[in-house]
Swiss-Prot record:
GO annotations of cellular component type: plasma membrane
GO molecular function: UDP-N-acetyl-D-glucosamine:N-acetylmuramoyl-L-alanyl-D-glutamyl-meso-2,6-diaminopimelyl-D-alanyl-D-alanine-diphosphoundecaprenol 4-beta-N-acetylglucosaminlytransferase activity; undecaprenyldiphospho-muramoylpentapeptide beta-N-acetylglucosaminyltransferase activity
Name of the protein in its database record: UDP-N-acetylglucosamine--N-acetylmuramyl-(pentapeptide) pyrophosphoryl-undecaprenol N-acetylglucosamine transferase
Record's bilayer topology term: Peripheral membrane protein
Organism: Sinorhizobium medicae (strain WSM419)
Upper classification of the organism: Bacteria, Pseudomonadati, Pseudomonadota, Alphaproteobacteria, Hyphomicrobiales
Free-text function comment from the UniProt entry: Cell wall formation. Catalyzes the transfer of a GlcNAc subunit on undecaprenyl-pyrophosphoryl-MurNAc-pentapeptide (lipid intermediate I) to form undecaprenyl-pyrophosphoryl-MurNAc-(pentapeptide)GlcNAc (lipid intermediate II).
Family: Belongs to the glycosyltransferase 28 family. MurG subfamily.
A UniProt-annotated Pfam family: Glyco_transf_28
Protein's GO biological process: carbohydrate metabolic process; cell division; cell wall organization; lipid glycosylation; peptidoglycan biosynthetic process; regulation of cell shape
Metabolic or biological pathway: Cell wall biogenesis; peptidoglycan biosynthesis
Cross-referenced InterPro entries: GlcNAc_MurG (IPR006009), Glyco_trans_28_C (IPR007235), GlycoTrans_28_N (IPR004276)
Catalytic reaction equation(s): di-trans,octa-cis-undecaprenyl diphospho-N-acetyl-alpha-D-muramoyl-L-alanyl-D-glutamyl-meso-2,6-diaminopimeloyl-D-alanyl-D-alanine + UDP-N-acetyl-alpha-D-glucosamine = di-trans,octa-cis-undecaprenyl diphospho-[N-acetyl-alpha-D-glucosaminyl-(1->4)]-N-acetyl-alpha-D-muramoyl-L-alanyl-D-glutamyl-meso-2,6-diaminopimeloyl-D-alanyl-D-alanine + UDP + H(+)
Length: 374
């Protein structure tokens, strides 16, 4: 039985789309039709997204002080708003759910103006610019790492956690396998949607400094930008280290599950997936992130002992080599970190968010929803 349409809106990066994808699976399983509004960047993720239809609506980043660029952005947003109104009038969704990024602004503004129930999900510990614009207008705010009981919008904020995709939940079934002695050691390195250029230089340089006995144990899976890929491959070939290097892995969850150690950025989706799967991590927050949201995300995992957090400016090749040497020599410590990471993970986040969406779509309030969950 089709319960109606839920319209999801997300920016076209993995950090926005992955939690939207997880919610879409839950809503589809509950009998809803799901449509997605996004931008052209989402094309590489579209094959896995369980939407009945994907719509591209014009939007633009608002940040430039250049009057010409500002005028262009305003025109794009106005065009997107008109298109979003037409789309909502045609689909008649029961609710519109935004996951951040400027492509969510036109459909969420249109929905609030048309009286359609609205929810935003903020993945990070610090609210992003698009969600800040929308927070006062929407009926409910779901938080990945947002604190539930503080802030101007505490009354309508629910700490759902960050929904993770079915592939991540499947990978979470794989227990962590410590690798001591001469056992092979799988290192997984990735940089998220902001790219992995820093890791493309830092990690091979660090691996080069390892003792021969440690290098012989090492196997590497590493995300690298297309322009860096050949150089990274050559670095590992020179060291005779088996390595898979690619700009994008469709099966990243499974690769994380097979890792003894992960080195990565600390975007919200990344931290959530690593913690649900339960793998020890070296987190290097993206230093140019607005509001330092990645540092705040990383702190949540480090507080449970699931990760070490190191600022990029402090992570020299020599220091990273020392960290890798220590990690590969102390499997029990990594096992404890894996357990700490798993304690942080919220595997039921997608289901909880789906329940919140259903409640708001049916006309209920956040206060009533919280009462039913207490």
């Amino acid at each position: 039985m089709d319960k109606g349409i839920i319209l999801l809106a997300a920016g076209g990066t993995g950090g926005h789309l992955f939690p939207a994808e997880a919610l879409a699976h839950e809503l589809k399983a509950s009998g809803y039709s799901v449509h997605l509004v996004t931008d052209s960047r989402a094309e590489r993720f579209a094959g896995r997204f369980p939407a009945d239809e994907i719509h591209v609506v014009a939007s633009a980043t608002i940040g430039s002080k250049n009057p010409v660029k500002l005028a262009r952005s305003a025109w794009k947003l106005w065009t997107g708003l008109r298109a979003a109104r037409r789309l909502i009038s045609r689909l008649k969704p029961m609710a519109v759910v935004g996951f951040g990024g400027y492509p969510t602004v036109p459909p969420l503004l249109a929905a609030t103006g048309m009286g359609v129930p609205t929810i935003i999900h903020e993945q990070n510990a610090v609210m992003g610019r698009a969600n800040k614009m929308l927070a006062s207008r929407v009926a409910a705010i779901a938080g990945g790492f947002l604190p539930e009981g503080t802030g101007a919008f505490a009354a309508k904020t629910v700490a759902t956690g960050n929904p993770v995709r079915p592939a991540v939940l499947e990978a979470a079934r794989v227990p962590y396998a410590p690798a001591g002695g001469d056992a092979p050691f799988h290192l997984v390195v990735f940089g998220g949607s902001q790219g992995a250029q820093f890791f493309s230089k830092a990690v091979p340089q660090a691996v080069c400094r390892l003792d021969d006995a440690l290098r012989r144990r090492l196997k590497v899976t590493q995300q690298a930008r297309p322009e860096d890929r050949e150089g990274v491959i050559a670095s590992y070939e020179k060291l005779d280290i088996p390595a898979e290097v690619s700009p994008f892995f469709t099966d990243m969850a499974g690769r994380i599950a097979s890792a003894q150690l992960v080195i990565c950025r600390s975007g919200a989706s990344t931290v959530s997936e690593v913690s649900v799967i339960g793998r020890p991590a070296i987190l290097v927050p993206y230093p140019y992130a607005l509001d330092h949201d990645q540092a705040a995300n990383a702190a949540a995992l480090a507080a449970k002992g699931g990760a070490r957090v190191i600022a990029q400016v402090e992570l020299s090749a020599e220091r990273l080599a020392n960290i890798l040497t220590d990690a590969m020599s102390n499997p029990d410590t990594l096992a404890q970190m894996a357990a700490g990471a798993r304690q942080t993970g919220k595997a039921g986040a997608a289901r909880l968010l789906a329940l919140l969406v259903e409640a708001i779509a049916s006309g209920s309030t956040v206060a009533k929803f919280k009462e039913t969950r207490s």
